[in-house]
């Protein structure tokens, strides 16, 4: 392998249609984000908001999945991550559709005059406690800078009446998040519990909330089969993105 190829592999993740560099981002490209970006409902979406975009992964995945006239706003508090997201977008097929904003979502959201029919976030979920290696990683992983109640309130202010707000969380935290959302007037419309294999309990949950009441569709996704290869359902969900599927 050439040195340049090795650096690319260390510093980012190559998908079928785009490359995500993440060496200057606290949170790297991982299965959680890939699941959320591939799973979120995009039918009839006209405008998308990505809260805490990090490397820009979710914004890029949603750009691939939606029509060319759908604008995407991606908001990131950390300046280094936002700059890398801007670079990833600039080198992607969709630089004209994705706008990265270096800002605090709590300051940015009240200034908006349009609403979004898809809001997506891979939010922090740890309560402040054990220190992280860097302040940037602590910001990305802990709810001190954006607690879940505030996130739900911001999404409620920015969403259209029939829009969806989608998140991925650890199973137990997702259950608490769901209860908090219901208490605030949200309706759970989609839920997918994610397990590593058939023998294990779910460890992640994908959730889609809406201001509008309606039937809730729930299912379960297993990432790997008994042979340790990706399952048919996981492959079907993500094969538009993974390079070797």
UniProtKB/Swiss-Prot annotation:
Catalytic activity field: adenosine(37) in tRNA1(Val) + S-adenosyl-L-methionine = N(6)-methyladenosine(37) in tRNA1(Val) + S-adenosyl-L-homocysteine + H(+)
Subcellular location: Cytoplasm
GO-annotated molecular function: nucleic acid binding; tRNA (adenine-N6)-methyltransferase activity
InterPro entries tied to this protein: DNA_methylase_N6_adenine_CS, SAM-dependent_MTases_sf, Small_mtfrase_dom, tRNA_Adenine-N(6)_MTase, tRNA_adenine-N6_MeTrfase
GO biological process, one term: tRNA processing
SUPFAM superfamilies linked to this entry: S-adenosyl-L-methionine-dependent methyltransferases (SSF53335)
KW NADP (keyword) present: no
Residues of the signal peptide: none
Gene3D superfamilies the record matches: Vaccinia Virus protein VP39
The family this protein is said to belong to: Belongs to the methyltransferase superfamily. tRNA (adenine-N(6)-)-methyltransferase family.
UniProt function note: Specifically methylates the adenine in position 37 of tRNA(1)(Val) (anticodon cmo5UAC).
NCBIfam families: tRm6a37MtseTrmN
Protein name: tRNA1(Val) (adenine(37)-N6)-methyltransferase
Organism, scientific name: Salmonella typhimurium (strain LT2 / SGSC1412 / ATCC 700720)
